[in-house]
Amino acid sequence: MATVYDVPGDLLVERVAKALKEVPEIKPPEWAPFVKTGRHKERLPEQEDWWYYRVASVFRKVYIDGPVGIERLRTWYGGRKNRGHAPEHFYKAGGSIIRKALQQLEAAGFVQKVPGEGRIVTPKGQSFLDKIATELKKELEEQIPELKKY
């Protein structure tokens, strides 16, 4: 059985985002169409379903780096801000988006809080991600036969 570590992250996040659309607890907040993802961004996200991709990305990040807290995730999703003539400066991403994503993953039973440490993936969440990774790996093996040896 393949795990999250065995498949490319971008393909996995895309698949997980599609699967999360069918989970009733995961849905974009009312304000999602109107917000930037952080201080460092100039524009809103272009994709209409960007919320599911961010939740899937946060889910994968908690799986790989867990236990992880909101501040560390804010740093991960942050970036450099173009300040005109002034030198560029790093800014963290918005905390509300990450917080709401983690709360929705908790409500779905995929993530749980560990007091003083952050959040970790539950066995249900690990199973959810590993099943998607296994399906994805089988498809990749059909396209690229050399991957079967791994």
Curated annotation (Swiss-Prot):
InterPro entries: Ribosomal_eS19, Ribosomal_eS19_archaeal, Ribosomal_eS19_CS, WH-like_DNA-bd_sf, WH_DNA-bd_sf. This is Small ribosomal subunit protein eS19. The keyword NAD does not apply. May be involved in maturation of the 30S ribosomal subunit. GO terms for cellular component: cytosolic small ribosomal subunit. One of its GO terms (molecular function) is structural constituent of ribosome. It comes from the Archaea. GO terms for biological process: ribosomal small subunit assembly; translation. Keywords: Ribonucleoprotein, Ribosomal protein. Part of the 30S ribosomal subunit. The keyword Ribonucleoprotein applies. Belongs to the eukaryotic ribosomal protein eS19 family. Pfam families: Ribosomal_S19e (PF01090). The gene is rps19e.
